[in-house]
């Protein structure tokens, strides 16, 4: 199914919670959300890419990892946004190029659009951790004065 997302300004937390609630209905895994990001600090472009990247990583954990627990953590510190999606699933070998499939490339593309860095940590039997880090733009920080 295709998932289209449009966000109104200031609704990041609600959109994220709604999307994860929808996905939780498709799995027995427990999805835990800790969102400390203020919607005010995110523009609509950032919100869409963040929610979609989190969605893709969560779907990967549900479909491929056989995870029982998925943790989503969103935080901002000194102008740096960090989003972590971690699961306790089967994990995979990062050197297995067959696993560099469509979903991973979409997440990399979204990270690039945010001018951020996407790190994936995993090993067979060790679950998976996806970490996106990016710097808030200077223009946005000036608007908050």
Question: What label would you give each PLM region?
Answer:
Residues 1-145:
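Coiled-coil dimerization/phosphotransfer module
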């Amino acid at each position: 199914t295709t998932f289209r997302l449009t966000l109104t300004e200031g609704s990041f937390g609600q959109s994220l919670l709604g999307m994860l609630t929808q996905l939780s209905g498709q799995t027995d895994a427990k999805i835990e959300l800790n969102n400390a990001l203020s919607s005010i600090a995110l523009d609509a472009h950032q919100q869409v890419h963040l929610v979609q990247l989190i969605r893709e990583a969560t779907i990967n954990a549900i479909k491929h990892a056989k995870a029982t627990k998925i943790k989503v953590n969103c935080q901002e510190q000194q102008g740096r946004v960090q989003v972590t999606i971690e699961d306790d699933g089967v994990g995979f070998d990062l050197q297995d190029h067959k696993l560099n499939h469509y979903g991973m490339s979409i997440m990399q593309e979204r990270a690039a659009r945010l001018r951020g860095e996407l790190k994936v940590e995993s090993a067979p039997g060790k679950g998976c951790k996806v970490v996106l880090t990016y710097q808030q733009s200077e223009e946005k920080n000036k608007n908050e004065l």
